[in-house]
């Protein structure tokens, strides 16, 4: 039996430099069971092996895509008898949205030390329930894919632009994201396709249970169960009881984006009505569009007019919150 099981993806951005330190730390602590995978299809076998050591905490060491693949297998695989252990996430990818939401910031080794210290105590005060987004459609996969953050419309095109055009330049993450933000805003300001800018978003139809239908061209589409996201503040409605997903849609106009940005910085997003900014909560969200890209924790899916993407929340899954 191990206190902590660590599932690492050596190909994650941070692990390219950090993994030797992680290996050394695990070698110095017998109560950590370390398993490395290089491909998503290896995660099922990894979790079957990890289940045999009965860890108190499962730690995922990789980017948001690695976390998404692990959560999907953990939820559907049934590898653990009874309830699975709480999940902790190390900040070792490019965006680290999930790790950030769970209070894991800064040095991954410090975060791992914190996990190990908590695993030696009563975990109950540090366990939080998080609903996941179950995505079906937009892929031939037979079972829903699980994640915590979905981006679509102009946001998805901008993320893909950053991934394929900016990251290969080798810039620091903060600078890559800043350059991408500026170019994304420039694309909206110009209002037409340009070779050096992110692709313009395609028209979408978004249906939310109990809230109606939103249709048009949007600069920003986000569905999330995360609570901390924009400027380290809480998502609108995050203080409410669990039971629904949060949707943020911003129309493709610079004034609407500026209004949303200013409201986010001031902590007023969701508290006041803003023209061109739509905030909804729902138990089922349908996204339809002609070959419109969406990204769930970094994995690409495509909505179509005859094959909508359907999002539903899962029951709460236990996570380990590292913040004091």
Regions found by a protein language model. Give the residues of each.
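Short N-terminal binding/cap micro-motifs at the start of the first secondary-structure element
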Residues: 13-17, 157, 229-231
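Short, solvent-exposed amphipathic alpha-helical segments in soluble enzyme
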Residues: 21-24, 75-76, 163-166, 237-240, ...
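Catalytic core of DAGKc-family lipid kinases
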Residues: 13, 37, 76, 80-219
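ATP/nucleoside-binding phosphotransfer catalytic cores, i.e., glycine-rich phosphate-binding loops
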Residues: 208-215, 231-324
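Cofactor-binding loop segments of dinucleotide-utilizing enzymes, especially the Rossmann-like FAD-
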Residues: 8-9, 92, 252
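ATP/NTP phosphate-donor binding region
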Residues: 1-61, 65-77, 109-113, 119
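Short glycine-rich anion-binding loops that position phosphate/pyrophosphate groups of nucleotides
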Residues: 63-66, 72, 92-95, 153, ...
């Amino acid at each position: 039996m191990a206190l902590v099981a660590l599932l690492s993806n050596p190909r994650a951005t941070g692990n390219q430099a950090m993994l030797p330190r992680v290996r050394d730390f695990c070698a110095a602590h017998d109560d950590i069971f370390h398993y490395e995978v290089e491909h998503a299809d290896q995660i099922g076998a990894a979790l079957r092996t990890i289940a045999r050591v009965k860890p108190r905490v499962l730690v995922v060491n990789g980017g948001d895509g690695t976390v998404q693949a692990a959560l999907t297998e953990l939820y559907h695989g049934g590898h653990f008898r009874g309830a699975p252990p709480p999940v902790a996430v190390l900040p070792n990818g490019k965006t680290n949205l999930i790790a950030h939401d769970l209070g894991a910031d800064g040095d991954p080794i410090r975060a791992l030390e914190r996990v190990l210290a908590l695993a030696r105590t009563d975990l109950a005060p540090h366990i939080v329930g998080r609903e996941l987004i179950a995505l079906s459609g937009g892929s031939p996969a037979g079972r829903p894919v699980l994640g915590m953050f979905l981006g679509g419309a102009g946001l998805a095109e901008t993320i893909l632009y950053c991934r394929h055009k900016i990251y290969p330049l080798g810039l620091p993450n903060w600078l890559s994201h800043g350059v991408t933000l500026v170019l994304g805003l420039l694309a909206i300001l110009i209002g037409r396709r340009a070779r050096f800018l992110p692709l313009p978003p395609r028209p979408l139809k978004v249906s939310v249970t109990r809230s109606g239908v939103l249709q048009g061209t949007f600069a920003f589409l986000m569905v999330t169960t995360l609570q901390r996201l924009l400027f380290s503040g809480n998502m609108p409605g995050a203080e409410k009881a669990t039971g629904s997903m949060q949707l943020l849609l911003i129309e493709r106009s610079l004034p609407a984006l500026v209004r949303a940005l200013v409201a986010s910085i001031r902590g007023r997003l969701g508290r006041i009505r803003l023209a061109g900014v739509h905030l909804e909560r729902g138990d089922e969200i349908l996204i339809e569009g002609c070959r419109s890209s969406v990204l769930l924790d970094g994995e690409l899916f495509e909505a179509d007019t005859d094959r909508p993407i359907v999002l539903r929340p899962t029951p709460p899954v236990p996570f380990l919150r590292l913040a004091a």
